[in-house]
Amino acid sequence: MTMIFDKGNVEDFDKELWDAIHAEEERQEHHIELIASENMVSKAVMAAQGSVLTNKYAEGYPGNRYYGGTECVDIVETLAIERAKKLFGAAFANVQAHSGSQANAAAYMALIEAGDTVLGMDLAAGGHLTHGSPVNFSGKTYHFVGYSVDADTEMLNYEAILEQAKAVQPKLIVAGASAYSRSIDFEKFRAIADHVDAYLMVDMAHIAGLVAAGVHPSPVPYAHIVTSTTHKTLRGPRGGLILTNDEALAKKINSAVFPGLQGGPLEHVIAAKAVAFKEALDPAFKDYAQAIIDNTAAMAAVFAQDDRFRLISGGTDNHVFLVDVTKVIANGKLAQNLLDEVNITLNKNAIPFETLSPFKTSGIRIGCAAITSRGMGVKESQTIAHLIIKALVNHDQETILEEVRQEVRQLTDAFPLYKK
């Protein structure tokens, strides 16, 4: 009898699946990736995630499991926990959350009850689905009230948020965003929370790598709980992370994750998280994070200098920015689709006080973490901005679009993703 273990080559065993995987590898290699929530992991991260740890069930936590044979995964998970604590300067860390959404769900469970009032950033202003969208579990379970940005500056107005907090008296305030290009003042958010006797939770999923490197202010000293993903700017596997300095809350968080929300943790993913945390603890990671900041600022500046486009809030302090494209093309969806055709990948995005449907939007969102991982710098970032503009302005000129495709290929060839 042929054992399943003999089937070690995906290409030979499942050609149909392999072709799809290979096509995705080619897409990543030859497309410029500007989706702000995406990045490129190291081969070491992929190796850990593809290890034999995927075979092991380990309900519970290190030293307190429900199954036997967990002595090895206990070491793995403890490494991930200790590295996360060191990386972010936190007293406690939970590395079991499967995703950022589940990390947020666990934080809510640890802090508040169903039906409680929560003040979170409105999705249209740059917040995330899990910050109270009515179609999400957060909006269905809790009474979320959204805060926005200032209509003139398109930045957070902390005085206005304080007045809103006084009016609605939330049990919890959520800070953090998925499409906000400015630095967030977590100290001011904590002062607002203290003023109304609310908890403060910070979702730093997008900026975690920048925080780890010290190029963005850390929420850890101010928030009761900090949640994050481990991919995006942190450049690890897709997964979640929860941090706190409060021992009592740490116990509630652990109970909320298991058994509250999840069963067995994904120890192969936790191993990959441990690798990513070690990479982020390397001094070179600070250079990488600063390069993200520099590249994003350089790319945004190109749009700011072109009056056919409007840079939301006038600039960026982190890895992302939004651009209103409606002077040159009907909406963000058309812009996204057109740029896909020239092998530049980004996403349509609502802008503050959006007037178009969320399925169309007035803007596009651009992030520079992935191109920075490829080794691209300020010069290449400026070039990419000019290519985007060239394509959008000439969206009905196939000859010019072909020129853009060729220039994109030259760039990706010059900065290969995974060295052959």
UniProtKB/Swiss-Prot annotation:
Keyword Cell wall biogenesis/degradation attached: no
Residues reported to bind (6S)-5,6,7,8-tetrahydrofolate: 123, 127-129, 357-359
Modification N6-(pyridoxal phosphate)lysine, positions: 232
Pathway: One-carbon metabolism; tetrahydrofolate interconversion; Amino-acid biosynthesis; glycine biosynthesis; glycine from L-serine: step 1/1
Lineage top rank: taxon: Bacteria
Chief localisation class: cytoplasm
Biological processes, Gene Ontology terms: glycine biosynthetic process from serine; tetrahydrofolate interconversion
Cofactor: pyridoxal 5'-phosphate
Keywords: Amino-acid biosynthesis, Cytoplasm, One-carbon metabolism, Pyridoxal phosphate, Transferase
Subcellular location: Cytoplasm
GO MF annotations in UniProt: glycine hydroxymethyltransferase activity; pyridoxal phosphate binding
Leader peptide range in chain numbering: none
Transferase listed as a keyword: yes
Catalysed reactions listed for this entry: (6R)-5,10-methylene-5,6,7,8-tetrahydrofolate + glycine + H2O = (6S)-5,6,7,8-tetrahydrofolate + L-serine
Listed Pfam families: SHMT
Site (Plays an important role in substrate specificity): 231
Gene Ontology, cellular component aspect: cytosol
E.C. number(s) listed in UniProt: 2.1.2.1
InterPro entries according to UniProt: PyrdxlP-dep_Trfase, PyrdxlP-dep_Trfase_major, PyrdxlP-dep_Trfase_small, Ser_HO-MeTrfase, Ser_HO-MeTrfase-like, Ser_HO-MeTrfase_PLP_BS, SHMT-like_dom
Family: Belongs to the SHMT family.
Record's subunit section: Homodimer.
Function: Catalyzes the reversible interconversion of serine and glycine with tetrahydrofolate (THF) serving as the one-carbon carrier. This reaction serves as the major source of one-carbon groups required for the biosynthesis of purines, thymidylate, methionine, and other important biomolecules. Also exhibits THF-independent aldolase activity toward beta-hydroxyamino acids, producing glycine and aldehydes, via a retro-aldol mechanism.
Name the record gives this protein: Serine hydroxymethyltransferase
